[in-house]
């Protein structure tokens, strides 16, 4: 039983590598200004070719090598967007692993290097030059002349170039294509072309001078019925301060709300269409599931920032031989088995909510959703489910295969089997435990999909 589940997972994961697995390309997504990563020579768009002489095929390969070389210097060969190759020496530091299901307590990281890139959505200051040219908060810049734009850093590069060369470019026309919300329910977007000339940027020094803002502090959504809605916060409002704290990053918004003392309402200063307003908001305690399955109870006011991330560049990797597929399939099966064991341990320790236990409805929905995403996602889901069944069957619960193994171990230790009566009692206890687990899974499915809790 369990061994067939294990072997099936190896087969499925190996099949994925034979068909060709789509994974993130080894490309630097974003580099924070004035960070260690920038000072060491990394730039957004750089392609990572090798680390300490080891070739890199995917970003996952790069992350594994960072993990292996924590608190050390590494030699990295990169290819910049202009196709020029460079040799860089990078300092790798340690970071506490955010994945609580991993066996590794720390991972390798480079300060200022981001694995995701913000999309080219802009905030626009009311009454600014950018506003007068026709740009609006929430516009997503998708193209500048014939160049496709897929991330914020490309927008910065283009505008800074125009500002620096405004006089020499004179009246050169520039066509900027944006996507903008076009309906009342904000589900559809219209494509708009805005034409400008380079010399219109001659008197400015930075993008901020033109009137463009990073979108981080603008609101994308105000949750219905939330304290924010009751205080009349609206989409595209920009948060300026909370109490006496001037807000520069979204993390400050979260931290100030989470640290609410439960007494006086928070004074939230916002800018709406150029007008400064102060709203009194009393946060409320909400419970929500994190991406890692932990139940997080904290103060919230019901707002989401206008931050979206660009789709990463993908690369399709195919195993060169059958033996490589088997090796990779086995390695991934072992990795996921380890994570599954850790998830069970965290569940019993109470670090992961029991609400994550799902039954047939959850399994069916996962299979359906993954199938709609493509054959690779579907096969990956089947492999993960097979590993879960493998681990579940090995739990030392009578009725399951793991329970039988547990009895055999007892027999070896004692030198004789348990009595029939003790076996019957153990089987009954195991049956009750298994039924309880099934009822809990079914209950979670119904509350999640039918009662939306």
Walk through the language-model features, giving the residues of each.
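Transmembrane helix boundary and interhelical junction motifs in multipass membrane proteins
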Residues: 395-405
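Functional transmembrane alpha-helices
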Residues: 105-134, 140, 165-170, 175-179, ...
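Short helix-capping/hinge motifs at transmembrane helix termini and TM-loop junctions
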Residues: 12, 16-21, 349-350, 372, ...
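Short extracytoplasmic/periplasmic juxtamembrane "stem" segments immediately C-terminal to an N-terminal membrane anchor
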Residues: 27-49
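Short, conserved catalytic or interaction motifs in soluble domains
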Residues: 53, 146, 244, 402, ...
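Internal alpha-helical transmembrane segments
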Residues: 1-30, 82, 118, 123, ...
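Interdomain regulatory linker/hinge segments that flank or connect interaction modules
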Residues: 2-9, 51-103, 144-203, 270-274
């Amino acid at each position: 039983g369990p061994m067939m589940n294990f072997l099936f997972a190896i087969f499925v994961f190996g099949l994925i590598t034979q068909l060709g697995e789509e994974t993130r390309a080894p490309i630097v997504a974003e580099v924070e200004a004035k960070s260690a990563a920038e000072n060491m020579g990394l730039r957004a768009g750089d392609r990572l070719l090798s680390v300490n002489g080891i070739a890199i095929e995917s970003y996952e390969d790069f992350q594994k090598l960072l993990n292996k070389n924590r608190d050390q210097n590494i030699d990295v060969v990169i290819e910049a967007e202009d196709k020029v190759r460079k040799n860089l020496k990078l300092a790798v530091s340690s970071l506490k692993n955010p994945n609580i299901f991993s066996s590794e307590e720390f991972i390798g990281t480079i300060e200022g290097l981001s694995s995701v890139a913000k999309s080219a959505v802009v905030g626009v200051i009311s009454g600014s030059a950018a506003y007068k040219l026709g740009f609006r908060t929430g516009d997503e810049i998708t193209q500048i002349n014939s160049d496709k734009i897929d991330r914020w850093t490309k927008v910065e590069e283009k505008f800074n170039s125009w500002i620096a060369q405004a006089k020499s470019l004179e009246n050169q026309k520039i066509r900027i294509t944006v996507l903008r919300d076009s309906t009342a329910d904000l589900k559809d977007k219209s494509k708009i072309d805005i034409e400008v000339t380079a010399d219109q940027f001659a008197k400015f020094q930075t993008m901020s001078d033109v009137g463009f803002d990073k979108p981080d502090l603008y609101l994308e959504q105000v949750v219905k019925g939330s304290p924010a809605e009751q205080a009349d916060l609206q989409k595209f409002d920009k948060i300026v301060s909370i109490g006496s704290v001037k807000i520069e990053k979204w993390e400050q918004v979260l931290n100030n709300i989470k640290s609410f003392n439960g007494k006086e309402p928070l004074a939230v200063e916002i800018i709406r269409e150029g007008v400064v307003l102060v709203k009194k908001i009393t946060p409320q305690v909400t419970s929500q599931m994190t991406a890692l399955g932990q139940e997080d109870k904290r103060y919230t006011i019901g707002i989401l920032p206008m931050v979206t991330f660009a789709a990463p560049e993908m690369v399709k990797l195919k195993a060169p031989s059958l033996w490589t597929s088997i090796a990779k399939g086995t390695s991934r099966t072992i990795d996921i088995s380890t994570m599954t064991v850790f998830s069970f341990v965290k569940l019993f320790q109470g670090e992961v909510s029991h609400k994550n236990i799902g039954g047939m409805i959850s399994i069916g929905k996962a299979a359906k959703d993954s199938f709609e995403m493509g054959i690779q996602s579907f096969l990956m889901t089947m492999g993960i489910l097979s590993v879960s069944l493998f681990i579940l069957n090995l739990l030392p619960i009578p009725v399951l295969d793991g329970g039988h193994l547990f009895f055999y171990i007892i027999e070896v230790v004692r030198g004789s089997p348990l009595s029939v009566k003790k076996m019957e009692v153990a089987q009954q206890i195991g049956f009750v435990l298994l039924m309880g687990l099934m009822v809990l899974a079914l209950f979670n499915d119904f509350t999640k999909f039918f009662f939306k809790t």
